[in-house]
């Protein structure tokens, strides 16, 4: 940035617009008693709003051509002739007045020294500062993402803003702010979302509730609002903005995905380690897990087969993983165990003699 700009010298603004489906999204008009064409209204979410164009700006140049003395129709024709993109040099009322007092002719060249000074830094120097300034830039960016408290007193025409709700997202939003209104003077902007009205949280409230809260404040209203970027930041932090965040510490976004993954893995492991198993079941499960990584596991299963067949037959893991030979052997043992034990002949004779 140039020294003059850093010292606070007023400068015009260059707004570059690309035509959208609904045009550029601003209204141009002339004012009685004033020379030139002025921006009357900037539609929310339009290319004009994204370019930085503001209601009340005076149009100085269109694509580098001065239009200060042209008629309304001539200016409109120039903008339409630009087809799908246009470059507008504008000044806000305050800057316009200061430049006139200084006797400075407003033109696009006023911005070029600033651009050259920004590009004059050699790449090596830029690389040197880049790593060191990155964290500071991020911190500065976080400091900017704060709610704003807009305090306004009702004027002859009210506060000078329109409130609306959006079906696609919850909350009450500022649709438009009238030029030179109490709302504009308070810093209220189009697309701001209302968080508090006169210190009362409006989260989850309906349109009628918010309107009633504003009217309930009498001739003064204090609106805590957030712009779109700040709103998204606080939602990532899972925190509702409040007046404490106007100058207090800001929350930090967090991600617990990895923590949840770790805890879920522990949840799967812990029951297996805590639930008591017989020695037979433990040996079987170890053999089964090794089977996925080794071709020798069947040999280990045969060698580690226990002598007790009644408990092994109740374990489904063993039944699913035994070899054919082991299965035949168990079936043979099972049939043998069902046969009646042989009777001692001496007892047999004794039994018959008793009958």
From Swiss-Prot:
**Pfam family of the protein (one):** EBP50_C
Q: In which tissues is it expressed?
A: Expressed in spermatogenic cells.
One Gene Ontology cellular component term attached to this UniProt record is:
membrane
Task: Give the compositionally biased regions (Low complexity).
Answer: 270-286, 303-323
On assembly, the entry states: Homodimer, and heterodimer with NHERF2. Binds the N-termini of EZR, RDX and MSN. Binds the C-termini of PDGFRA, PDGFRB, ADRB2 and NOS2. Binds ARHGAP17, EPI64, RACK1, OPRK1, GNAQ, CTNNB1, PLCB3 and CLCN3. Forms a complex with CFTR and SLC4A7. Forms a complex with SLC4A7 and ATP6V1B1. Binds PDZK1. Binds the C-terminus of PAG1. In resting T-cells, part of a PAG1-NHERF1-MSN complex which is disrupted upon TCR activation. Directly interacts with HTR4. Interacts with MCC. Interacts with TRPC4 (via the PDZ-binding domain).
Has the keyword Phosphoprotein been applied to this entry?
A: yes
Chain segments carrying region Disordered: 110-146, 244-355
Q: Which PROSITE patterns match?
A: PDZ
Sites of Phosphoserine modification: 2, 46, 264, 275, 285-286, 289, 294, 297
According to UniProt, the name of this protein is Na(+)/H(+) exchange regulatory cofactor NHE-RF1
Where N-acetylserine occurs, the residues are: 2
Where is this gene product found?
Cytoplasm; Apical cell membrane; Cell projection, Filopodium; Cell projection, Ruffle
């Amino acid at each position: 940035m140039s020294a003059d700009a850093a010292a606070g010298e007023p400068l015009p603004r260059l707004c570059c617009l690309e035509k959208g489906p609904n045009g550029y999204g601003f209204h141009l008009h002339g004012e009685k008693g004033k020379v030139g064409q002025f921006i009357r209204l900037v539609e929310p979410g339009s290319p004009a709003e994204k370019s930085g164009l503001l209601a009340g700006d005076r149009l100085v140049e269109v694509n580098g051509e001065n239009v200060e003395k042209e008629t309304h129709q001539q200016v409109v024709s120039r903008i339409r002739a630009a087809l799908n993109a246009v470059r507008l040099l504008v000044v806000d009322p305050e800057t316009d007045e200061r430049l006139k007092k200084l006797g400075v002719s407003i033109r696009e060249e006023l911005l070029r020294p600033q651009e050259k000074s920004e590009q004059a830094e050699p790449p090596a120097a830029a690389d040197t500062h880049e790593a060191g300034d990155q964290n500071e830039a991020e911190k500065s960016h976080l400091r900017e993402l704060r709610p704003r408290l807009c305090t306004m007193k009702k004027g002859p025409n009210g506060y000078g803003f329109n409130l609306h709700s959006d079906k696609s997202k919850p909350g009450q939003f500022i649709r438009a702010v009238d030029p030179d209104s109490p709302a504009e003077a308070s810093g209220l902007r189009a697309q701001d979302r209302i968080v508090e009205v006169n210190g009362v949280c409006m989260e989850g409230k309906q349109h009628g509730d918010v309107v009633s809260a504003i009217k309930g404040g009498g001739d003064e209203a204090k609106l805590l609002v957030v712009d779109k970027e700040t709103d998204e930041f606080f939602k990532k932090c899972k925190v509702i903005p409040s007046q404490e965040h106007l100058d207090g510490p800001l929350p930090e976004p967090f991600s617990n995905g990895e923590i949840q993954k770790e805890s879920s893995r522990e949840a799967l492991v812990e029951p297996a380690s805590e639930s008591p198993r017989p020695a037979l079941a433990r040996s079987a499960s170890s053999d089964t897990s090794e089977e996925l990584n080794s071709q020798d596991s069947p040999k280990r299963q045969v060698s580690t087969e226990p002598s007790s067949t009644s408990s092994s037959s109740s374990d489904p893991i063993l039944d699913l993983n035994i070899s054919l030979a082991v299965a035949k052997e168990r079936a043979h043992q099972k049939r043998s165990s069902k046969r009646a034990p042989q009777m001692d002949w001496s007892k047999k004779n004794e039994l018959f003699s008793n009958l």
